[in-house]
Amino acid sequence: KENDEWIEVFINEMAAVGIQNIPLFIPKYCTDIKVHKNGFLQELPDINFEKQENKECIEATGLFLAFPYQGKISIMPTREIAFSSIVKRAADDCGTMLRFESSNTKNVLPINEKAERLTRDFALYSDTCKILIRDEKISAVLSKSYAILPAYELIELLEKQLATDHPMYTFDKGQVSHEYLMAEYLINDPEMEESFRLALNDAGGHVKTLKAGIRFSTSDVGMGKVYATLFYDANGTRMALSGRIELEHDGDSTTDKFKTQLQDLGIMFKESEEHIQLLANTDLADV
């Protein structure tokens, strides 16, 4: 989202607070909060349990994070989707920490005890991490090497390239959540689509109608890569092709690199067609 905020903090500057909601929520849990940190007892700001974002957090995992923000120590609610990345920063992503439902043989460690354990873990690490704040909640706490590739910037680059290569392109459908974004576009290029349809039929297919498109997918909460994948709708059935662009959320990856890769989309469609033609001309005795 355009109003996302990324901040970088030292892991050992963070502390975790767990507010229990089971079997009963007690408001005093949200006041006079103290954590043991580096041999000292550190006081933290109160949590306004009537605020909607805080209430939702308490009803979900109950995990809050405290860290330096805007010149002071702030405490913020976390989303459920952030939990796995938080425990990874503490190198404590085990079943005991990740379990939130009991089984016949395994019980759940209360969230306040998980938080105490996380705070102790955080103190052992002096690396930095990247915190994603979205709509007043923490959506992810990722490693220092995580490359921030804003989805809205990538979408703009893709649409500009599509407008250059396929001026008649249209948006087809998509999905969006705090975890994931997917958008599919139809290129509406009759000449190219007809050429590919004929290639499929030469290979033994019985394709009457064919539409070509591109699927874009990414995530800001730890998904390893950005993808732009080619697909065809053959007789109304959508099929992914082998050709695709991918860029890891890691190291020196940038939106400029993605922009450069997008210039190869036209070549990838052509290579897919040539691959089908090659298969059509392959003698099974040679396989």
Can you say where each PLM-predicted feature lies in the sequence?
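Intrinsic disorder/low-complexity polar-acidic segments
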Residues: 148-287
